[in-house]
Curated annotation (Swiss-Prot):
RNA-binding as UniProt keyword: no
Matching Pfam families: HMG-CoA_red (PF00368)
Family under the similarity heading: Belongs to the HMG-CoA reductase family.
Gene name, Swiss-Prot/TrEMBL: hmgA
EC category: oxidoreductase
Summary of the function given for this chain in its UniProt record: Converts HMG-CoA to mevalonate.
Protein name in the entry: 3-hydroxy-3-methylglutaryl-coenzyme A reductase
Lineage of producing organism: Archaea, Methanobacteriati, Methanobacteriota, Archaeoglobi, Archaeoglobales
Origin superkingdom: Archaea
Membrane-spanning segments: none
Disulfide bond positions: none
GO biological process, one term: coenzyme A metabolic process
Length: 436
């Protein structure tokens, strides 16, 4: 395997100078090796890290220790979204995804947002919720009173579980309690509000819930059953905003089309499901690339969207100049320590490419990516339709499935797109003609 030569001019004291721009015109036209060289120079990847990207990223012995009954590893394409300027910093965003056009769409949206200064973001903090279910209570409201009266004791007991987290400024910060009606009668639900710092937080929160459960049983006289983290991270929100200049994105008609598409999603849950799915295309791809629990992120996002009726996670408005202003608010329980983020070699490399060191920064980037992905989808729907870009890339997959290799792939795709026949049988027919 040929090892790429990295341009050491971009290094200083062994670290990359991140003054390089993520705006890389023609990046998609480069070969895989040329793209990786650009990324390696941007992120300061070592020769060993470059080799890991080009070879099997997850060794079988590591995979066998991660989950049960391992028989192999399953790979996804790893792409790079370019052009992202977030809070004044340039990012190349790694995305692991099988769906065509997602990476290209995000890059194009980021290029348009960049014309107006890129994305600005906000983060509410790394607070997670641990739930303790208290049942069999004669007087649920009296039990709630007792929990809140002794919340300092509960917090102290919870923090005994993780002195290191407490020393870092994290730990259990508050207690909430509420009585709910269920088909099994009234229950008291106690929430531990835990600052998990740079972790996703499941292990720390679950351990705390289990630790304080006996004490809560004792002071309430009830029976505790579930003691587990909630994936609705309502206190761990990431927000992003971007202004899309009307002239850059195609004019007033495009702005109106996007606003009409947004209005459709805000009024109709059938459309809204697809609207929010498009947001998660980008975010989940980033989560997979960085070794985060994308199922937890998906669950939290859709649950948050459903509070008060299922609604879009993004909003769009038109400013006084006629430009489109997009915003997003989404729960973002991500981590940069623990779990697969430090076990999977490619996850570690993805975090290095991204250049983030904290969960907060990763959450901010994810929110910006989700907004970019959603804007790109709405713009495509409001103009040429989503299928054009999808089908051109789908044609490439079909050409490969038909057996095309090397330059044959481009020729088969060109003919299928020209003839408007994006089908596997036609791909095979075209390939047969080319080879005859």
């Amino acid at each position: 395997m040929q090892v790429l030569r990295l341009d050491r001019r971009h290094y200083k004291s062994g670290k990359i100078r991140r003054a390089m721009s993520s705006r890389i015109p023609g990046f998609y036209k480069l070969s895989v090796e040329e793209r990786l060289k650009k990324v390696a120079e941007f992120a300061g990847l070592s020769d060993e890290e470059v080799k890991a990207v080009l070879s099997q990223g997850l060794p079988l012995d590591v995979a066998d220790r991660m989950i049960e009954n391992v028989i192999g590893t399953f790979e996804l394409p790893l792409g790079i979204a370019t052009n992202f300027l977030i809070d004044g910093k340039d990012y190349l965003i790694p995305m692991a995804i099988e769906e065509p056009s997602v990476v290209a769409a995000a890059s194009n949206a980021a290029r348009m947002a960049r014309e107006s200064g890129g994305f600005t973001t906000d983060y509410t903090g790394s607070l997670m919720i641990g739930q303790i279910q208290v049942t069999k209570l004669l007087n649920p409201n009296a039990a709630k009173f007792e929990v809140l009266r002794q919340k300092d004791e509960i917090i102290e007991r919870a923090n005994e579980c993780d002195p290191m987290l407490v020393n870092l400024g994290g730990g259990c910060k508050d207690i909430e309690a509420r009585v709910i009606d269920t088909i099994m009668g009234k229950m008291l639900i106690v929430h531990l509000i835990v600052d998990v710092k740079d972790a996703m937080g499941a292990n720390a929160v679950n351990t705390m819930c289990e630790k304080v459960a006996p004490f809560i049983e004792r002071i309430t006289g009830g029976k505790v059953y579930l003691r587990i983290i909630s994936n609705l991270a309502a206190y761990r929100l990431a927000r992003a905003k971007a202004v899309f200049d009307k002239d850059v994105i195609g004019g007033e008609e495009v702005v109106e089309g996007i606003m009409l598409a947004y209005a459709f999603a805000a009024a109709d849950p059938f459309r809204c499901a697809t609207h929010n799915k498009g947001i998660m295309n980008g975010i989940s791809a980033l989560m997979i690339a960085t070794g985060n629990d994308f199922r937890a992120i998906e669950a939290g996002a859709h649950s948050y969207a459903a509070i008060g009726g299922y609604k879009p996670l993004t909003t769009y408005e038109v400013d006084r100049k006629g430009n489109l202003v997009g915003t997003i608010e989404i729960p973002m329980a991500v981590g940069v320590i623990g779990g697969a983020t430090k076990v999977n070699p490619l996850a570690k490399i993805s975090l290095k490419i991204l250049g983030v060191n904290t969960a907060e920064e990763l959450a901010r980037v994810a929110a910006a990516l989700g907004l970019a992905q959603n804007f790109a989808a709405l713009r495509a729907l409001a103009t040429e339709g989503i299928q054009r870009g999808h089908m051109e890339l789908h044609a490439r997959n079909l050409a490969i499935m038909a057996g095309a290799t090397g330059d044959e792939v481009d020729r088969v795709v060109e003919i299928m797109v020209r003839d408007g026949k994006i089908r596997l049988d036609y791909a095979k027919e075209v390939l047969e003609r080319l080879r005859s």
